[in-house]
């Protein structure tokens, strides 16, 4: 499934937060004590989040916590020496789609899977409502060399959020 990366691969996770989702992803990708040899580069802007991620990494070899701004990958990109096949972004900043496209162009392999968790409330949108925002994001992704495999409304879990499952084709 495109929603999960291949076991033992290297993934980039932008907007790692306190590590709840990272912990579940780690179990799949790395296995107990990293028996699969996977690696998660987990980037977050908040020092409090990094503290929690660093604590989590002590018991999870292969988890690399990074204090950094997802928009400024020149500052932390050296920690991702090769392109990845799977990238997940869950940042609460305006310009989410631009951050995602830039990161994917820099770090995601062609034919790689990129997941964008888009929060409508984080955008400075002056258009005709959330549906128009989500449609404009789809258009921008397609125009930037991504195929949209699926868009999943997260209503009931996270209101006003859509998860875009994309494949980089250019």
Residue locations for each model-derived region?
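Conserved SAM-binding loop of SAM-dependent methyltransferases across substrates and taxa
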Residues: 18-35
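Glycine-rich helix-loop-beta junction characteristic of Rossmann-like nucleotide cofactor-binding loops
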Residues: 1-6, 80-81
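Glycine-centered, small-residue-biased loops immediately flanking beta-strands
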Residues: 9, 38, 112
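Conserved SAM-binding motif I beta-strand of class I
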Residues: 36-44
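S-adenosyl-L-methionine
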Residues: 43-96
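A short acidic, amphipathic alpha-helical/loop segment
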Residues: 24-28, 99-104
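C-terminal substrate-binding/active-site "lid" region of AdoMet-derived donor-dependent transferases
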Residues: 51-55, 101-169
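Conserved class I S-adenosyl-L-methionine
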Residues: 6-19
């Amino acid at each position: 499934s495109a929603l999960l990366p291949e076991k033992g691969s290297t993934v980039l996770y932008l907007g790692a937060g306190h590590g709840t989702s990272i912990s579940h992803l780690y179990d799949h990708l790395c296995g107990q004590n990293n028996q699969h040899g996977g690696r998660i580069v987990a980037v977050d802007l908040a020092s409090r989040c990094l503290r929690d991620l660093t604590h989590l990494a002590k018991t999870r070899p292969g988890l690399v916590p990074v204090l950094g701004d997802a928009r400024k990958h020149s500052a932390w990109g050296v920690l991702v020496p090769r392109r990845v096949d799977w990238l997940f972004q869950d940042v609460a900043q305006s310009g989410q789609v631009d951050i995602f496209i830039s990161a994917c162009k820099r770090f995601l392999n062609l034919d790689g899977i990129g997941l964008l968790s888009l929060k409508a409330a984080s955008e400075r949108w002056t258009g005709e409502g959330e549906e128009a925002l989500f449609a404009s994001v789809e258009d921008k992704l397609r125009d930037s060399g991504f195929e949209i495999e699926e868009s999943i409304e997260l209503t009931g879990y996270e209101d006003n959020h859509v998860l875009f499952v994309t494949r980089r084709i250019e």
